[in-house]
Structure formats: C-alpha cells, structure tokens
Amino acid sequence: MKKQVLGFALFFAMTSFSFAQTTWKIDKTHSNVKFTVSHMVVSEVEGSFKMFDGSLVASKPDLSDASINFSVDVASVNTDSERRDGHLKSDDFFNAEKFPKMTFVSKSFKPLGGNKYALTGDLTIRDVTKTVTFDVTYGGQVNTGRGVKAGFKAKGTIDRLAFGQKFNPAIEAGGAVVGKDVEITIFAEMDKQ
C-alpha cells in the first residue's frame, strides 16, 4: 500500500512538474526593438521604439508550446531626428494618436534545430492584422543569483504598405523615398517570474 501511495505521489509530482507553466516578462532595460528601412533607394535609416512590453508563457522545456505577446507604443519611435519622428507618428505612417499600439500575438513557436526557432503570429499595425514570421535565435538561460534570465533575438521583414502606411512617393531615378520593406530586430532579455 505504501508503495502504491508513493508511486501515485511520484507520478503526480512528475506530471505536475512537466505541465507547470512558466511565465517570462521582458526586461525593458536590457531589451530593444529596432527597425531598418531603405531611404532614397541608396541608403538606409535605422530607428527604434523606446516603450514596449512583452511576455512568454511555456510549459515545455524546449519552449515549443510558447505563447508570446508583445506590444509597442508607436509614439516612442526614435530615429535621432525630431522632424522625422514627428512624421512617423503622423497619418502618413503610424497615426500614433488614433492607433497608439503595435501588437504581436503568437500562433506558433516552432523549433528548427539547435537554438533556432520560427515564430509565427498576428502583427497588428494601424488596426490591420497580418500573419508574419520571425526568425528567432534562443540565447539560453542563466541564473544571475537574483533570478533566471533568458535571451532571444527575433528578426523579420514586413511590408509596411500592407499595414496601411500611406507615405510612398516615387523618386525620379526609380524606386521610392522610403522603402516598403522594413526589417525588424528585437533583442529580448526575459525574466522568469
């Protein structure tokens, strides 16, 4: 009888452990959201967003069941030019007054082997939602003595015009003043809760 009780207790402990969900919150001080877009066809402009939030919830050790949510305050855009930042906040681009948040909600986090993943989900900008995929590199975990941290780098490209951004004047030499493809890179350091 004692063996049965012990066996049941061990089984319960193991199944509880294996299905325990772990939540990770983004460490905003040690993370950033950057973007790059072509300008006048011949060069690129880089920028970032200063205000954002994100979380990851998973129960599997390989994170393959991870649910990821991310949001960006578009009014926090910074390209080191107040004039350009003001233009990006206008209706030509983000319309930050009417659509203050850009959001991402994951659909899948697929392991590709090693530390590589494909993160697919719904990205919403200007109230337009499209399914996008980011290439993710998982940096692993470390116990700092004050808690456990995990690191991720996500990279992907979106068509900004598909999200309702209107500014798209052509230049005489061909092409557009601002490219339609925007490369997004997120460096996320997450704190285990």
Stretches found by the model and what they are:
Residues M1-T23:
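Bacterial Sec-dependent N-terminal signal peptides
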